[in-house]
């Protein structure tokens, strides 16, 4: 199946969803050589991954993951692709805690650092939040505390077959897209930041076909896989079974533009300190970007009707002490 897929890819032909699914199944099962795996990943990257191919690969990867079921709960994820080179602090992790304090159920899927100094797993460990949760513990944490971390490497064990090849290739592959598309929990919504504007609409199509009810796939004009405060953010939103593309700016929400340097982070320890400062009410650009992204989670999490209301609520959550209180509850 994989060899047939490679032959099509080198002719720059698009794989069907089932062909991509079959090829990825073989990879996940560890049935292929590293040479064939590298050829498949390189060929896809050169050709450009299409919606059907991403969908098929995501389906295979999810089927190989350890499952987490949150019955009768509408939970969302805020996992992004990473790889944006922005060197920001862990914005989505911070915004997730704020949103959870506002009543959103967060199934935060993530991993240790890839291209940055601090992945979500790294900063949460530094914050004292448990990352090594079993499926039943994830379910209980989401139900009782409103947020739990799903450590990707513990739930996607088949990825061990891929790790050496990805490291050897040294460039972005389809797996950079698959991470945020393969949350082991049966989420209903997602805020998904991507490293390239060209990916927002295609990945929204994938999420829609995966059955998500609400989602925002977004990319900042500066390349951030977050809603940025340096300028415009491109958004592809899933709502009522359709995808709408639009642009938002910080001033639309009464937030002043800042420089990318103003939201830079560092080591997991430094980023943990930044997050605690924000949750305790410290102002400035770092709070602003956390508030904007928390607003997206509050909106997709069905707590607010729009982003403007989300911004107001996120500010109130922080200023009332509820955000820091939620953090204390999580540790």
UniProtKB/Swiss-Prot annotation:
Gene Ontology annotations of biological process type: L-tryptophan biosynthetic process
Reactions listed under catalytic activity: N-(5-phospho-beta-D-ribosyl)anthranilate + diphosphate = 5-phospho-alpha-D-ribose 1-diphosphate + anthranilate
InterPro entries: Anthranilate_Pribosyl_Tfrase, Glycosyl_Trfase_fam3, Glycosyl_Trfase_fam3_N_dom, Glycosyl_Trfase_fam3_N_dom_sf, Nuc_phospho_transferase
Record: residues binding anthranilate 1: 80, 111
Keywords carried by this UniProt record: Amino-acid biosynthesis, Aromatic amino acid biosynthesis, Glycosyltransferase, Magnesium, Metal-binding, Transferase, Tryptophan biosynthesis
Residues holding Mg(2+) 2: 225-226
Enzyme class: transferase
Pathway(s) the chain acts in: Amino-acid biosynthesis; L-tryptophan biosynthesis; L-tryptophan from chorismate: step 2/5
Top-level taxon: Bacteria
Pfam families for this protein: Glycos_trans_3N (PF02885), Glycos_transf_3 (PF00591)
Binding site for 5-phospho-alpha-D-ribose 1-diphosphate: 80, 83-84, 88, 90-93, 108-116, 120
Binding site for anthranilate 2: 166
A GO term, aspect molecular function: anthranilate phosphoribosyltransferase activity
The keyword Glycosyltransferase appears for this protein: yes
Keyword Metal-binding listed: yes
Named cofactor requirement(s): Mg(2+)
EC number: 2.4.2.18
Cofactor binding note from Swiss-Prot or TrEMBL: Binds 2 magnesium ions per monomer.
HAMAP family linked to this entry: TrpD
NCBIfam families xrefs: trpD
Quaternary structure, from the entry: Homodimer.
Entry function: Catalyzes the transfer of the phosphoribosyl group of 5-phosphorylribose-1-pyrophosphate (PRPP) to anthranilate to yield N-(5'-phosphoribosyl)-anthranilate (PRA).
The protein's name: Anthranilate phosphoribosyltransferase
Organism of derivation: Clostridium acetobutylicum (strain ATCC 824 / DSM 792 / JCM 1419 / IAM 19013 / LMG 5710 / NBRC 13948 / NRRL B-527 / VKM B-1787 / 2291 / W)
GN (gene name): trpD
């Amino acid at each position: 199946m994989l060899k047939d897929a490679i032959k099509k890819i080198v002719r720059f032909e698009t794989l069907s969803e089932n062909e991509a699914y079959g090829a990825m199944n073989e990879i996940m099962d560890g049935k292929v050589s590293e040479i064939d795996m590298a050829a498949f990943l390189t060929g896809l990257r050169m050709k450009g991954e299409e919606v059907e191919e991403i969908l098929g690969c995501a389906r295979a990867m999810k089927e190989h993951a350890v499952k987490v079921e949150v019955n009768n709960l509408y939970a969302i994820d805020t996992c992004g692709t990473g790889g944006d080179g922005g060197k920001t602090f862990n914005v989505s992790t911070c915004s997730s805690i704020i949103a959870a304090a506002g009543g959103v159920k967060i199934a935060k899927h993530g991993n240790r650092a890839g291209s940055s100094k601090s992945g979500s797993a790294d900063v949460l460990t530094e914050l004292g939040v448990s990352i090594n949760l079993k499926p039943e513990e994830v379910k209980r944490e989401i139900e009782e505390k409103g947020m739990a971390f799903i450590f990707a490497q513990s739930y996607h064990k088949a990825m061990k077959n891929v790790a050496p090849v990805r490291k050897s290739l040294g460039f972005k592959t389809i797996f950079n897209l698959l991470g945020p598309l393969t949350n082991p929990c049966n989420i209903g919504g997602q805020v998904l930041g991507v490293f390239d504007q060209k990916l927002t609409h295609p990945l929204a199509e994938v999420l829609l076909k995966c059955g998500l009810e609400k989602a925002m796939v977004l990319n900042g004009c500066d390349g951030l896989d977050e809603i940025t405060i340096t300028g415009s953010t491109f958004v592809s939103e899933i709502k009522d079974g359709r995808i709408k593309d639009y642009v938002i700016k910080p001033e639309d929400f009464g937030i002043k533009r800042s420089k990318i340097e103003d939201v830079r982070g560092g080591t997991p320890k430094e980023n943990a300190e930044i997050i605690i400062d924000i949750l305790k009410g410290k102002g400035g650009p770092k709070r602003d970007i956390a508030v904007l992204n928390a607003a997206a989670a509050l909106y997709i999490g069905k707590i607010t009707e729009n982003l403007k209301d989300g911004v107001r609520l996120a500010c109130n959550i922080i200023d009332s002490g509820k955000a820091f209180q939620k953090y204390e509850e999580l540790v």
